[in-house]
Amino acid sequence: MKVSDALLLVLRCLRQRIPEDRLIWLNRELLGYRQDDLEALSDHHMGLNMFLAWISEPRRRAPLEVPGYRFLEGVWGRIDRSGRLVSVMEPELAQRQIFCNIGIQQIELQLDEMEHPTEALFSLSFDERTGAEFFCESAELVRVYDHVRSKLIDFLDKVIAELRVA
């Protein structure tokens, strides 16, 4: 079963059984982190360039626990005429991490489109001024995906134990 399907099923099954604030993480992972989530993150991580792939209308949200596993390692660069990645040395592009705010379903789609999902290089963000892109190895997406799967299993184990006691 795909992690996105599992997240959706868990959300549907637990919506009336546990407090809504405990389900926010599931929703963020399923649909992606919102603009107001990203603003809260930038308050905690000044200087990190954020990849804003999904933005929606602001709503009241629970305080954000910074999901460190969603920071992807990479490099700012350009692909040269021979197809090689060339690093860009611009002071404002010194970050080597960006926050991946897209939902798990989008991550699944990205990985499905890659011929070799553990060896590919992909671009996450673009800087218009320099023409540079932020490149990551696809293994970074796999790492996020696996972490969410593991965290979901831990969450389910905990909730099942709590519901048995109640």
Description of each model-found segment:
Residues K2-R60:
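N-terminal interaction modules that seed assembly of large macromolecular complexes
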Residues P58, E65-A166:
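Internal, Lys/Arg-enriched amphipathic helical interaction segments that engage polyanionic partners
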